[in-house]
């Protein structure tokens, strides 16, 4: 049976493409590798930032996105324990190979002035949590057992 072998990219809506690219490039070290007009979407912009392991983090901005309100508990969870509507993203977790890299990411993120919680040991993984621009709840995790 053929099935996917992983995630190529996840696309997050943004009202401020420049701010998001700067955050993920500077804070997480993910370089911008492509930015282009969205095919068949007038005024739409699609950007790709590369992560280790052959996957990408993607940002999408449409002309009306900046005017769409962020509503915690509906459009965004706001925290790792927060609620949001069915079909929305509760949080985005990035992967690192081990606890040493997790601690290095925590320290790097903190040097950028971002508050980081953790690491927390969940048994199957260890994680740190922090907030990105536009109320995105972010996590970096490594194997725990």
What are these regions (language model features)?
Residues 13-64:
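Core segments of cupin and vicinal oxygen chelate
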Residues 66-95:
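Helix-adjacent hinge/juxtasegments
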Residues 8-9, 46, 57-58, 91, ...:
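Histidine-centered active-site/metal-ligand motif
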Residues 50, 103-145:
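Vicinal oxygen chelate
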Residues 1-19, 89-94:
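N-terminal beta-strand motif that seeds the catalytic metal site of vicinal oxygen chelate
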Residues 1-2, 39-47, 53-54, 72, ...:
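Amphipathic alpha-helical "stalk" segments
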Residues 19-20, 99-104:
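Short, conserved charged micro-motifs
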